[in-house]
Amino acid sequence: MRSGGLEMMSSSAIVAFNLKEGKNWWWDVNESPVWQDRIFHVLAVLYGIVSVIAVIQLVRIQLRVPEYGWTTQKVFHFLNFMVNGVRALVFLFRRDAQNMQPEILQHILLDIPSLAFFTTYALLVLFWAEIYYQARAVSTDGLRPSFFTINAVVYVIQIALWLVLWWKPVHLMVIISKMFFAGVSLFAALGFLLYGGRLFLMLQRFPVESKGRRKKLQEVGYVTTICFTCFLIRCIMMCFDAFDDAADLDVLDHPILNFIYYLLVEILPSSLVLFILRKLPPKRGITQYHQIQ
């Protein structure tokens, strides 16, 4: 009995020691300027890779259908190229960005790619909504004006928050700004759930022998799940970021948290979606290929 008790105490001591060592490792990495730069540079490389993949796909689409102008598909890939390219530059010069003055410039530099990411994937929701309503013989005339209006409202509100934060740099305004973006992320997640879910259910009702039905069904299902999950995670994380200093993403001494967060909400989702949507459009006779007016 006594030896068993000693073994249990020894096991508990080992577990406690391992937890302490793990905590110390996390702290050491977060506080080390060398590790901070390494992690931010790894993020820059990953974003750069995604950006290059997006622009390569854009060029392939242009070479395949040069007779079309700026279609939804081309704009989607171009925005992916821009968003990931800007993120790569931000993380490459992350330490310099943190020292920018006035401080409002730091917020703008870190927030603009997030807003552009929202616009990029809202465009995908618009594309699916158009397909869904066209298949049901419902007018889609109001969809694009709604898309531009929603984006304009989001950008105007965010710019107003930046201006107020510049005029009165209090912590309350930072909280409001982050909670606003949490709301925007939740709105995007619900958009994917609504129109991705509707399109998925509609495709399920098509005859089994329909050409491409199975592949398109999988494509819509996968992309809906990925995008809904990433925007929901972003929403939840923004709520923690707003109220908990330990979850602050806009500082240099949380590199591991930054790596996990941006990997889950931007890098992996963008990579997976670009892979799933890698199929090139047919050269002629394409009815779902919409040109941006």
UniProtKB/Swiss-Prot annotation:
Intracellular or extracellular location(s): Vacuole membrane
Record has Repeat as a keyword: no
Stretches of the chain found on the membrane's Extracellular side: 1-38, 95-107, 168-173, 241-255
UniProt superkingdom: Eukaryota
Membrane topology: Multi-pass membrane protein
Result of knocking out the encoding gene: When associated with TOM1 disruption, reduced efficiency of intracellular multiplication of tobamoviruses (e.g. crucifer strain TMV-Cg), characterized by a reduced accumulation of viral coat protein (CP) and reduced amplification of TMV-related RNAs.
Pfam families for the chain: THH1_TOM1-3_dom
Transmembrane region(s): 39-59, 75-94, 108-128, 147-167, 174-194, 220-240, 256-276
Cytoplasmic side: 60-74, 129-146, 195-219, 277-293
Keywords for the protein's UniProt record, in alphabetical order: Membrane, Transmembrane, Transmembrane helix, Vacuole
Any Gene Ontology CC annotation: plant-type vacuole membrane
InterPro entries assigned: THH1/TOM1/TOM3 (IPR040226), THH1/TOM1/TOM3_dom (IPR009457)
Functional description taken from the UniProt entry: Contributes to the intracellular multiplication of tobamoviruses, probably being a membrane anchor promoting the formation of the replication complex.
Subunit comment: Constituent of tobamovirus replication complex.
Family: Belongs to the plant tobamovirus multiplication TOM1 protein family.
UniProt-recorded name of the protein: Protein TOM THREE HOMOLOG 1
